[in-house]
Amino acid sequence: MAFLAMDLDVHGHPDLSRRFVDRMAKGLGDPNLHRLIDFYKSQRAQVRGKVGGLRAAEDEVPLRERARSRAEARHRYQWALRYAVAGSEPLVVVIMGRPGTGKSTQAEAMSRALGWPHLASDRIRKTHAGVPLHGRTDAETRERLYTDTLTETTYATLRTRALQRARRRLGTVLDATFSRFAQRERLRTALRAADVPYVFVELTAEDDELKRRLRRRSAEEATASDARASDFEMLTERYEAPDALEDSRHVQIGTAGAPADTTLEILKTLIRRAD
């Protein structure tokens, strides 16, 4: 049963998967089936991933077929992790925090691990403004990029795209500072109204480390972010840090360690919350 439910999800039919599980729970007289099925779907997805991985490692299998098997194995492992993190629901993972905390690095890692798109405010903002995504912007362009109007348009786009995917029962990773309480509250309100699960993952680091990272970023050309070391005090002053009472669906993760360790800690935290 879990194999079929999982395969229906993977092939783009979550509605049929849900209906199938509903019918089975009713037919078996098992009201707890919905609480258990995601565990077994995750396990079955891992089995499919293992089979694909083994096939991809066999020398006698043609190279093209091995590549397909490798891609299929990766896809199934992503599904296994999705079930562990979000069950069968379309979770919205919001990676937020001050500039320099590693939001884009971790959002991209979450995107790769879960197979969900990474929607970054920096890219959306520049796309709306018709500005090249990478490379430094001059003072005049930066002033145009960070008007209140364009900022609200950028965050509205993040909300809209996350909701559009959630209606199709698909998860999303959002990447933005979310420095204002009002920005977070508008997203929360929209997701709650649509009954979409979400979690804010606030990344943190010591001030000295943030300054060091921003100085390093100032020398880079291939970055979509415009935050620089010279902006640190201004950006810190504008940041309205969430407090413990703002939202129970909020976690803090330190980013002092290696990026891969931070990614693992985020995933473990999300899995613990799902339990």
Language-model features: locations:
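Conserved substrate/cofactor phosphate-moiety recognition/catalytic segment
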Residues: 111-170
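Conserved lysine of the Walker
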Residues: 103
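Hydrophobic positions on the alpha1 helix immediately C-terminal to the Walker A/P-loop
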Residues: 106
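Loop/turn-to-beta-strand initiation segments
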Residues: 168-172, 197-199
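Small-molecule kinase domains that catalyze NTP-dependent phosphoryl transfer to phosphate-bearing small molecules
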Residues: 216-265, 273-275
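Conserved phosphate-donor/acceptor-positioning beta-strand/loop module used by diverse small-molecule
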Residues: 194-214
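Active-site activation/catalytic loop segments of kinase-like enzymes and analogous catalytic loops
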Residues: 1-28, 42-60
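ATP/Mg2+ or Mg2+-diphosphate-binding catalytic cores
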Residues: 50-98
